[in-house]
Amino acid sequence: LHVRSRRQRQMCIRDRFIDVAEGRLSLDDFMAQLSDDDLIHLLGGQPNVGVSNTFGFGNLPDYGVPSIMTADGPAGLRISGECSMNTTAWPCATLLACTWNPALVQQVGQAGAEEVKENNLAVWLTPAVNIHRNPLCGRNFEYYSEDPLIAGKMGAAMVKGIQSQHIAASVKHFAANNKETNRKHSDSRVSERALREIYLKGFEIIVKEAQPWTIMSSYNAINGHRASENRELLEDVLRGEWGFKGMVTTDWWTRAEHYKEIKAGNDVKMGTGFPERVKKAMEMGQLGRPELEHCARRVLELILKID
């Protein structure tokens, strides 16, 4: 009888997130039952499932929160090499920009998202909209242009196409990530004017025109302050000035401190979080439950959007 009663209680708990999705329970009431450990768990990346090779997030099975798997782009869907699945190699971003045709790019985004969904994935880590600052950048082919207007318009079209299929687009790498050499440790020194008119402008256009569900912060520092720990960038500019309502993830395996990223409004640390460090920060009074709740809410809101 004791085992049956416990199992019944667990089944009731697992149904709770479904109740939120179906309108029988508020997200506030759902989150009120989560422990600090549960919230911290939501703020770190989760192991690969299925064909994914870029990890995921969510994954609170006792509460019915699913694992939401990601897949890399941008020139087509990249999945685990161990899977015997074929995917489409779409033209790279630079070539798509050469069409000067946002409607066509939107169609590519839609078709790509359909393929993402067919493979039981939910977040496509594209578009990449960094600026062609130097022709020697090793990932220029992933970026649209040296012109932030073209990058923004093409990126917005891609996001609209992807999200029309209820798949989340992840706009990256925010911001001033314009080289590959030593990018986990580099510091992009840039004036306020150049930052806003060149390196942020494409992201601003995408946020205002396409409302992306996720944005990926970059490894690099900007004027001495790591992008993933930069509250001015993530809260004041991205959310405050531009009106971004979605979730922010780090780039994979950042060297930044997890609790500082949470304080800055960087919601999920990918590929995995550092829960013990976050707990230690809470014990030392450097981080509070309200900050965990702000980030976890955005994670759960994103999961509710995905079909």
Question: Where would I find each of the regions flagged by the language model?
Answer:
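Second-shell residues forming the walls of enzyme active-site clefts
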Residues: 144-294, 298-301
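Single conserved hydrophobic/aromatic residue that forms the stacking wall/gate
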Residues: 2-9, 13
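A structural signal for short hydrophobic/aromatic patches embedded in well-ordered alpha helices
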Residues: 27-30, 42-43, 108, 295
